[in-house]
Every structure is written in C-alpha cells, then in structure tokens.
C-alpha cells in the first residue's frame, strides 16, 4: 500500500509540474497596462438607491440602445429577507452611467403561477466586446431575458426553490413595459 501511495503522489506531482511548466507568465508591464485600462478612478457610490429601508437593489445589468445607456436591476421589497414578497425587475436610463432615471418595471409580481413572487431578470444577448456596441441583440424578432422565478415569498429561495424562466418582448427596450414571461419554467429543480 505504501508503495502504491508513493507512486500515486509522484505521478500527481509530475503531472502538476508538467502542466505548470507550460503556463505562461504575464509580465508586470502587461498587468499594469490591463489595470490602467480597467481601473475605476472614482468611486461614486450607489447610482440607483432604494426608496427606503424596506427595499433592496441588486444585480444591475447595463446595455446600450442608440446613444443612451439602460440598466435593468432587481428590487426586493423587504428589509431582512423574510418579510418581503420577492423580486421584481426594473429599468433605468442614463446618458453618463452616473445619473440614472428609473423608468419602471419590466417583470412585475403576478397574481398566480410558478413565478408569481420572484421575477429577477437578466437581459440576454448583450454585446460585451471590449469597446463594443453593448447593444442587446434580437433573436427571432424579440429581445430576451432569462429570469429566476418562484412562488415562494421572501429573499430568493428562502421558502421554496427558484426555477429559471425566459421572458421576451417585441416592444421598445428603452421603455418600461411588461415583458411576456414563461408559462412554465425552462429549468427547474
């Protein structure tokens, strides 16, 4: 047994050593150039703040349409995770990424259904290329958003599991309006 264990350890070390031998080192100059390009020179704090202590904001996603920026974000309507109903998805707009104006809801609570209390949406098909367009592309003539949905109340899956749904719209993505949501989850536990 001792010999087999020693062989296994030696083999593991040889494999690990072989893998790391081919790893490329990145110079300090290259790392500094990357840092200089992506650093945030100023800290501005929250650009969208909740209206009171009984609402929490989370999960911002930014995209561009025309010459304006848009941000979706989720709002939890509770204070401690157990007292609220759940998440809704909202939309805001900005010219400079610092001053934001809230436009309204995209995924609202529903009266019934698998996703009636949790609707945390995340826009899909955004061009994230560095210095790219940051626009949200269409698929089959619609804009899409994946979302966490659930019927349990509270923060996320505190009472019941969350599932994944898809929402879409043919409407104007620069305006707040209800998106069409899945009648059933596309991914569930």
Task: Locate each region found by the language model.
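Beta-rich carbohydrate-recognition and catalytic domains
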Residues: 24-121, 126-189
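Coiled-coil-like amphipathic alpha-helices with heptad-repeat character
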Residues: 1-2, 20
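Bacterial N-terminal signal peptides that target proteins for export
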Residues: 2-9
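A residue-level detector for conformationally permissive "hinge/kink" positions
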Residues: 9-10, 96
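Hydrophobic h-region of N-terminal signal peptides that target proteins for export
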Residues: 13-22
